[in-house]
């Protein structure tokens, strides 16, 4: 089980096009299970993209904290779920209020969506 990030705009656009969107109160999650050949030929199982807009918070420190929280949420959900066996790509877009909400609440929401749709 290994996670890597989406590297460029082309990869983000491809996952947005192929993936299914799930709108939650504090974030939008795009999951693509049917990955193109360029993703399947790598050793990584999960491709993660995080988009944190300046509209969410103007301070880079806060935006980076949000990214760290998201990465940790994904690592927690991947380590104790059936995600280890399949290849998929995800894009997470946090919404307003993401930085104030309790971490365990975010973990519950994210794990419910991922486990329902995998």
Curated annotation (Swiss-Prot):
Function: RNaseP catalyzes the removal of the 5'-leader sequence from pre-tRNA to produce the mature 5'-terminus. It can also cleave other RNA substrates such as 4.5S RNA. The protein component plays an auxiliary but essential role in vivo by binding to the 5'-leader sequence and broadening the substrate specificity of the ribozyme.
EC number: 3.1.26.5
UniProt family annotation: Belongs to the RnpA family.
Gene Ontology process terms (BP): tRNA 5'-leader removal
Phylogenetic classification of the source organism: Bacteria, Pseudomonadati, Pseudomonadota, Alphaproteobacteria, Rickettsiales
Protein name: Ribonuclease P protein component
Pfam families membership: Ribonuclease_P
Assembly behavior: Consists of a catalytic RNA component (M1 or rnpB) and a protein subunit.
Gene field: rnpA
GO molecular function term, any single one: 3'-tRNA processing endoribonuclease activity
Keyword NADP: no
Catalysis: reaction(s): Endonucleolytic cleavage of RNA, removing 5'-extranucleotides from tRNA precursor
Keyword Transport: no
Keywords of this entry: Endonuclease, Hydrolase, Nuclease, RNA-binding, tRNA processing
Gene Ontology CC, one term: ribonuclease P complex
């Amino acid at each position: 089980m290994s996670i890597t990030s989406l590297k460029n705009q082309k990869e983000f656009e491809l996952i947005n096009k192929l993936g299914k969107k799930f709108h939650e109160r504090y974030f939008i999650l795009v999951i693509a299970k049917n990955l193109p050949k360029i993703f399947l030929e790598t050793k990584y199982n999960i491709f993660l993209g995080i988009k944190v807009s300046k509209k969410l918070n103007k301070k880079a420190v806060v935006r980076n904290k949000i990214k760290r929280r998201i990465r940790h949420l994904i690592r927690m959900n991947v380590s104790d779920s059936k995600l280890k066996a399949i290849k998929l790509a995800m894009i997470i877009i946090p919404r307003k209020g993401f930085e104030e909400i309790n971490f365990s609440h975010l973990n519950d929401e994210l794990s419910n969506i991922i486990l329902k749709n995998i």
